[in-house]
């Protein structure tokens, strides 16, 4: 059973610190961005999953987050909230980005994601990266002034339940990790 409410129990067992991280990132976006565009994306690597992928030192997902942050000229810890993990068996990343709605509409965020992933993969043009990224869910606007804000927050927690699964049995350190920037107080 689930110790923290709103997570999809069908995906249990959960790791409590990962549950806290999912909630922390969404609460931070709500607190610091006033009106946040939340998007879940899938980023694929254009080569096969092999031993070279498992033993490499570069974590492409973190390179993507750093590149997105640089391209949007983000103020550290304020303009971008995110979650990131890698699939344990496939060369792909699952990412949640929360950006300020006032700065990024849907098409602008599309371009930002494509530019960043293209840059990380070393492609000459963003169009080359298009087959290797896709939006998994429609954008959700999380606005603290909205009367349905609490319901939207609960829906997002449920939708991102798979990020909080217990990964202790996963061998690859990158796939075992749930990275994010919840900005815990203290």
Give residue ranges: language-model regions.
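Short, well-structured alpha-helical interface segments that form or flank functional binding sites
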Residues: 59, 63, 88-94, 108, ...
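Histidine-centered divalent-metal-coordination microenvironment in nucleic-acid enzymes
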Residues: 80-103
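Catalytic "initiation/cleavage/transfer" segments centered on a nucleophilic residue
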Residues: 1-35, 101-186
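Short, solvent-exposed polar/charged micro-motifs at secondary-structure junctions
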Residues: 51-52, 92-93, 138-139
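Signature for HUH/AEP ssDNA processing cores
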Residues: 24-87
């Amino acid at each position: 059973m689930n110790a923290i409410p709103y997570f999809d129990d069908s995906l249990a067992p959960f790791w409590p610190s990962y549950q806290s991280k999912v909630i922390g990132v969404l609460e931070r976006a709500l607190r610091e961005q006033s009106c946040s565009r939340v998007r879940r994306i899938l980023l694929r690597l254009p080569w096969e999953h092999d031993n070279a992928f498992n033993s490499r030192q570069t974590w492409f997902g973190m390179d993507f987050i750093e590149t997105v942050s640089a391209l949007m000229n983000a103020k550290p810890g304020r303009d971008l909230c995110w979650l990131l993990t890698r699939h344990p068996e496939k060369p792909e990343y699952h990412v949640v980005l929360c950006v300020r709605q006032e700065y990024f509409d849907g098409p602008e965020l599309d371009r930002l994601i494509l530019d960043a992933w293209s840059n990380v993969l070393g492609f000459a043009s963003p169009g080359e990266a298009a087959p290797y990224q896709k939006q998994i869910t429609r954008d959700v606007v999380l606005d603290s002034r909205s009367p349905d804000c609490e319901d939207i927050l609960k829906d997002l927690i449920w939708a991102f339940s798979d990020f909080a699964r217990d990964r202790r049995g996963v061998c690859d350190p990158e796939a075992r990790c749930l990275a994010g920037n919840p900005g815990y107080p203290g």
